Structures are given as C-alpha cells and as structure tokens.
Amino acid sequence: MAMRGGSAIKDQDRSLVYSAEDLWSKALDRGGVVNFFGSTFTLPQQKILGDLSAMQRTVDFWLQSKALQSRFPNLGPLVVRGRKGERKAHYEPDGVIAIPLDQPWACKEAVLVHEFAHHCAWSTDAPAHGPAYRHAMVEVANFVFGAEAALLLRAAYDGAGLEVADAT
C-alpha cells in the first residue's frame, strides 16, 4: 500500500497488470503475424534499448510528440537513470525512471513504455496501476507500437478482468 497525499491508496491491481503486460511484452518479443479472433495483423518486434543514453533519447522523443502532448498536456521533463542492486524498474513522481541495467528484461521498450505511462497518469489520488494508468499505457503503446499492439494490450487487460479508464 502506497502513501499518496497523506492517505493510503491500495494498488490492488498491480500483479494482474504485470501479468497482462508480461504476456503482451512476450508477443512484442516475437513480433510478426498474429491471428486475433479471426483478424490477421502484423505486430512490430520491440527493441532492446542497450544503454541509458538510448533510453533517454527515446523518452525525449516521446515527450516531444504532439500526439502524446495532446493526450497528456501536463507532461514534464523525465530523466532515465540506472538503478543498482534492485531487480525492478520504477517510476519516481519527481520525473525519474530508474532502470536496473544489469537485468536484460529491463532494457526492453515495453518496460520503458510502462514507466513512461506512469509519468503520463501519475496522480496522488489514484492507485499506481489503476484504470487511469492502464488508459495511459494503452495510449502510449498505441503511439510507440501502433494500434494493433494497443489492441492486444487492451485485450490482455480485459482478459485479466481489468478496466481501462476512458479518456477524459
């Protein structure tokens, strides 16, 4: 349970979100042709961003995107830094993404998208992996990977019984 704004907000969906996003990330690892309920489309293969400078350039590009700025008009600067001795990536509300560079999975685009979505949706009044976060994640996935990947992510959330907030 995280403290936000002086009160405890339970992040009850976190493990379900991680499971849904792990399935989605594995599909992006493979990329290629996907048959999805009778429709066939091609998924991109996610990149492995090998170092902090590549991750920072990627995040800077996303921050400068008019498409993401129009969806998330209050985006501030964001710094990507390394994280040692930890096995998880995380977002810090003061505009920092911390990546454990010694963990190969942490350098995948989907991990950076996840942490960037926290930056887009951060609120002291909502759970970190709640519906507003999931909405941001789908929007960022659509921008980075395309509509097909965003559709698969939304379906993974739906399969896990997770609501995605509507745009406000």
Regions found by a protein language model. Name each.
Residues 1-110, 119-168:
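Active-site-proximal or metal-binding-adjacent scaffold patches in catalytic folds
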